[in-house]
């Protein structure tokens, strides 16, 4: 059974290009900034925040994958991942 994870990556002293690189690295590893909203539409999470669904239960395993992606930016970084089995979202477009 799949688990749902949210991961937040903060790049220190980063440029917009650093976050674009991070986005590409996270995408390549199966992470997405797009998440289903309660209204059935899909919404984009803020920069540096990602969603992933995987058949593992250990947030540390997901966090390690995100750290590998962040390492590719060559910036110092902070990464936190958590598993959530129940969640809801109401992300307003444009915010």
What are these regions (language model features)?
Residues 7-9, 50:
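A structural signal for short, well-ordered beta-strand segments
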Residues 67-93:
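C-terminal structural segments of small proteins and small subunits
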Residues 1-5:
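Short structural boundary motif marking the start of a folded domain
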Residues 16-19, 59:
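Alpha-helix N-cap/helix-initiation sites
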